[in-house]
Curated annotation (Swiss-Prot):
Signal peptide, first to last residue: 1-22
EC numbers on record: 3.4.16.-
Protein name listed in UniProt: Probable serine carboxypeptidase CPVL
Assigned keywords, A-Z: Carboxypeptidase, Glycoprotein, Hydrolase, Protease, Signal, Zymogen
GO MF annotation terms: serine-type carboxypeptidase activity
Family: Belongs to the peptidase S10 family.
Function: May be involved in the digestion of phagocytosed particles in the lysosome, participation in an inflammatory protease cascade, and trimming of peptides for antigen presentation.
Sites carrying sugar chains: N81, N132, N307, N346
A GO BP annotation: proteolysis
Top EC class, one word: hydrolase
Entry keyword Signal: yes
Organism: Pongo abelii
Length: 476
């Protein structure tokens, strides 16, 4: 069945036409207050599950056609903590090709506090929002071949919300527990997908979320009656191991010409102090140093990086500012007809600031042990855009070289492979290092928001990885 499906995928590809405001700031986070007009009522699906009215809840979650959207999808809220009334918002798109067999892929945005609606509308969902608030079809949507589940995570992100401050996550264990509750409910509403292969994916700060939820699934599957069919994970430009990344910032920024010798020395000194605090588990102090030096998330003044480079964008070192069209989606989500269709009503679209404040101490902590566990047991894809600054390819590779997993020695000796999509291509798509089920990919011409800049390369990469078709070019 998979072989047949892959032939369809390749045929489809052959027929197709050929802010970053920072890791933690406002590129993904445009606050959308409740709009004027009839936005309908929020749909909470947990009561339907508990009452045994699953089919009714499923029918209500169907997204009605609006503004040109005609692809079947489902959306609503899943309650993950009744005590605090904590709810996660999801939007699910069954694959356009053979959804009954296609893998289910969970997408988590970074931040912390960035909505996965950014991934949906800016990166790889079926539609792109235009400047006049209409939709156009995306050329290479991941929803063609994969059933994509977008969740606003953690609680307090995007449309997800809680009624109590105790409902906010303060560490990755909290994040994983809420996600796990949502996933179990999701597969109750859509039981026909529970045996499909399941992958957890995400980018940036989701380099923590992805290993966290994968670790919890791995731990609970042997002892729970309801099991999630986890097959692997994919992390793009992931902030999984802050210490190894922070230590390389100064030299990297110097080598790409954004810092001079004097600035590099100051940057290195600050990074060294940050790492010292990390090693002493002074998490808050480490966060403050990094925030003032580079991120500028919770400070009132521009960061040192912004002052000396004059640039706010460190998702792509060829651009100084963020593309305007990456912000259209937030305005689109404020339209009453959109809110009514996706069943969020007048709920505020949160900017993520509160989420980040509660996760400040988590920011500089590593999830390397969990990532190692997943690398030892599942398929793993770690990818980077060539032009990224905040989680540069070289910094990710440095982190990987320091990991101790079953393939670590072989990985250190492995040769990098040139990856082209088609044999006739004059351009190289990227570079791959593969050891067993572990794949490290660097995408040429890509930035932190990879599918936005390189949609075809991102589409080809994720399908090669999930469907296990290797990295040899297609004939065509």
């Amino acid at each position: 069945m998979v072989g047949t499906m892959w032939k369809v995928i390749v045929s489809l590809v052959l027929l197709m036409p050929g802010s970053c405001d920072g890791l933690f700031r406002s590129l993904y986070r445009s606050v959308s207050m409740p709009p004027k007009g009839d936005s309908g009522q929020p749909l909470f699906l947990t009561p339907y599950i508990e009452a045994g009215k699953i089919q009714k809840g499923r029918e209500l979650s169907l997204v009605s056609p609006f503004l040109g959207l005609n692809m079947r999808s489902y959306a609503g809220f899943l309650t993950v903590n009744k005590t605090y009334n904590s709810n996660l918002f999801f939007w699910f798109f069954p694959a356009q090709i053979q959804p009954e067999d296609a893998p289910v892929v969970l997408w988590l945005q970074g931040g912390p506090g960035f909505s996965s609606m950014f991934g949906l509308f800016v990166e790889h969902g079926p539609y792109v929002v235009t400047s006049n608030m209409t939709l156009r079809d995306r050329d290479f949507p991941w929803t063609t071949t994969l059933s994509m589940l977008y969740i606003d995570n953690p609680v307090g992100t995007g449309f997800s919300f809680t009624d109590d401050t105790h409902g906010y996550a303060v560490n990755e264990d909290d994040v994983a527990q809420d996600l796990y509750s949502a996933l179990i409910q999701f597969f109750q509403i859509f039981p026909e997908y529970k045996n499909n292969d399941f992958y957890v994916t995400g980018e940036s700060y989701a380099g923590k979320y992805v290993p966290a939820i994968a670790h919890l699934i791995h731990s609970l599957n042997p002892v729970r009656e309801v099991k999630i069919n986890l097959k692997g994970i994919a992390i793009g430009d992931g902030y999984s191991d802050p210490e190894s990344i922070i230590g390389g910032y100064a030299e990297f920024l110097y080598q790409i010409g954004l810092l001079d010798e004097k600035q590099k020395k100051y940057f290195q000194k600050q990074c060294h102090e940050c790492i010292e605090h990390i090693r002493k588990q002074n998490w808050f102090q480490a966060f403050e140093i990094l925030d003032k030096l580079l991120d500028g998330d919770l400070t009132s003044d521009p960061s040192y990086f912004q002052n000396v480079t004059g640039c706010s964008n460190y998702c792509n070192f060829l651009r100084c500012t963020e593309p305007e069209d990456q912000l259209y989606y937030a305005k689109f989500l404020s339209l009453p007809e959109v809110r009514q269709a996706i069943h969020v009503g007048n709920r505020t679209f949160n900017d993520g600031t509160t989420v980040e404040k509660y996760l400040r101490e988590d920011t500089v902590q590593s999830v390397k042990p969990w990532l190692t566990e997943i690398m030892n047991n599942y398929k793993v894809l770690i990818y980077n855009g060539q032009l990224d600054i905040i989680v540069a390819a070289a910094l990710t590779e440095h982190s990987l070289m320091g990991m101790d997993w079953k393939g670590s020695q072989e990985y250190k000796k492995a040769e990098k492979k040139v990856w082209k999509i088609f044999k006739s291509d004059s351009e190289v798509a990227g570079y791959v290092r593969q050891v067993g089920d572990f794949h490290q990919v660097i995408i040429r011409g890509g930035g932190h928001i990879l599918p936005y800049i390189q949609p075809l390369r991102a589409f080809d990469m994720i399908n090669r990885f999930i469907y296990g078709k290797g990295w040899d070019p297609y004939v065509g």
